[in-house]
């Protein structure tokens, strides 16, 4: 995948996550603020918990920073897979954000 293709893909991913966070705020009454600055999306929850999704274009990865740790994801053409064998990106973000929100939320990509 070229860098241009990768950047277009991750732009869609970040837009999707940001939109879903807005939906949680409206539909589930989750107190969350989603802020995007270039290739970095920061989700801040009511208790101050931050989840940061960051694009690493040179490595063609998405990185997630959360209280539970740092995670790296690489796209295989269909899925964003954890480079260390953990859950895929949507499942991991769903779990991380559900814990921070205090209610079940689901990330779909």
UniProtKB/Swiss-Prot annotation:
InterPro entries: CyaY, Frataxin/CyaY, Frataxin/CyaY_sf, Frataxin_CS. Gene3D superfamilies: Frataxin/CyaY. PROSITE patterns: FRATAXIN_1, FRATAXIN_2. It comes from the Bacteria. The keyword Iron applies. GO terms for molecular function: ferric iron binding. GO terms for cellular component: cytoplasm. GO terms for biological process: iron-sulfur cluster assembly. The keyword Iron applies. Keywords: Iron, Metal-binding. Transmembrane segments: none annotated. Involved in iron-sulfur (Fe-S) cluster assembly. May act as a regulator of Fe-S biogenesis. Belongs to the frataxin family. This is Iron-sulfur cluster assembly protein CyaY.
């Amino acid at each position: 995948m070229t860098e241009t293709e990768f950047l277009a893909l991750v732009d869609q991913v970040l837009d999707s996550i940001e939109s879903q966070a807005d939906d949680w705020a409206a539909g589930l009454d989750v107190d969350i603020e989603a802020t995007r600055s270039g290739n970095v999306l920061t989700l801040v929850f009511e208790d101050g918990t931050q989840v940061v999704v960051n694009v690493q274009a040179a490595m063609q990865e998405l990185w997630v920073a959360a209280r539970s740790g740092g995670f790296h994801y690489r796209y295989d053409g269909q899925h964003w897979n954890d480079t260390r064998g953990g859950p895929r990106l949507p499942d991991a973000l769903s779990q991380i954000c559900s814990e921070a929100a205090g209610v079940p939320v689901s990330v779909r990509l």
